[in-house]
């Protein structure tokens, strides 16, 4: 298997198997936590899974680990990602097209931009998961980057289904309670983790 460094890998939890041109496979199903290199994903011809859905999660250090721990039935393939890396794009390309994809990200402008970028490179529809703008108890003003990004997000056809959430943030001038971690730990019973 390839060496892992920087953004040249994808981190995941759940059943996954790489299929190579020579007919060989590498099954990661029994492992709880997996890093797969972009080089290995590029070499394989397809990726199979017995999971019923794919859930990509923006926050690798906390939220991803909490949801992986709650995924006891392993019916969800959980992948840590923010902006789509080459390894994540390879994984998306090689997973079955019929596998439903959900993305759980922060709800500040950068979080919505990540959802947009994932949708731009994904061969399947990506549904937002738990991504609802919530006003902050103490408003967090939009910064210069946010204000530059908002018009692009509001105009993006790929974000039409979440435009109301982005508009609420823009109208209030408030980034809101945007961090995933403020929603608390997921329910241990598995999908939908609530």
Which residues does each predicted region cover?
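Nucleic-acid enzyme cleavage-core boundary/entry regions
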Residues: 1-98, 110, 116-194
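Terminal peptide-recognition signature
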Residues: 103
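Acidic/Gly/His-enriched mid-domain segments of enzyme catalytic cores or analogous surface patches
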Residues: 106-108
């Amino acid at each position: 298997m390839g060496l892992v460094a920087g953004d040249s890998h994808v981190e995941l939890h759940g059943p996954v198997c790489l299929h190579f041109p020579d007919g060989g496979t590498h099954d990661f199903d029994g492992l709880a936590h997996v890093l797969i290199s972009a080089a290995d994903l590029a070499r394989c011809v397809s990726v199979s899974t017995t999971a019923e859905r794919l859930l990509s999660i923006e926050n690798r250090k906390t939220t991803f680990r909490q949801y992986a721990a709650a995924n006891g039935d392993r019916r969800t393939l959980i992948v840590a990602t923010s902006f789509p890396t080459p390894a994540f794009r390879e994984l998306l390309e090689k997973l079955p097209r019929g596998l439903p994809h959900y993305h759980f990200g922060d709800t500040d402008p950068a979080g919505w931009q990540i959802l947009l970028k994932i949708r731009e490179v994904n061969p399947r529809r990506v549904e937002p998961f738990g991504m609802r703008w919530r006003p902050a108890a103490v408003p967090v003003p939009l910064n210069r980057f946010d204000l530059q990004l908002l018009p692009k997000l509001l105009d993006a056809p790929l974000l039409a289904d979440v435009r109301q959430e982005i508009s609420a943030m823009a109208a209030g001038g408030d980034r809101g309670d945007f961090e995933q971690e403020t929603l608390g730990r997921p329910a241990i019973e598995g999908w939908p983790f609530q």
